[in-house]
Amino acid sequence: IFEFKAGQYAELFIGDCKEKHFSMANSPNTNELEFHIKTLDGGEVSNYIKNDLKLGEIITVKGPYGNAYLREKHKGPIIAVAGGTGLAPILSIIEYSQEIEMKQPINIYYGAQSEQELYFIEKLDMITKTNNNLKFNPVIIEKSKNKSIRQGLVTDALIEDINDFDGYKAYLAG
């Protein structure tokens, strides 16, 4: 069993590739590890996973690492900011916070260049609609016809929405 805290990451050794760090994207309460991996031009590990990884191939996982994990005893409001695949550790934090029934306000900001770069948006919409303490704020730089997605920078949206950050815990990834 690989034990970790929501928000942490692991070091993966895959094939003959150089080790690579990826954040867990699921709750620590499962018997699985979920990683979100974007295929990058020239990305040795991501391209190996996409094109060459075989079913049953051994992947060595070391860790966990990182201090940006959910502080379960914090009772004040939380801000979770993600960009790109930085959504992975934020999803881990959000999922676990709901499992342990944290009730304080949790404001999720998810930024990207375009609407096409946003992923898991339906899952986040569903989670926030069924949990009154969660608020989901997708923000993109490019214009969109989708009125539920704000245009601009995620940092500007955050400042527009919250004028006093006293007492907040913030988790940022991406």
Annotate the PLM regions.
Residues 63-75:
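A short, basic/flexible loop-to-alpha-helix module at the beginning of a structural domain
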Residues 105-174:
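Reductase modules of NAD(P)H-dependent flavoproteins
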Residues 24, 91-99:
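Histidine-anchored nucleotide/phosphate-binding helix
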Residues 43, 60-64, 151-156:
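Short gly/ser/thr-rich secondary-structure transition/capping motifs
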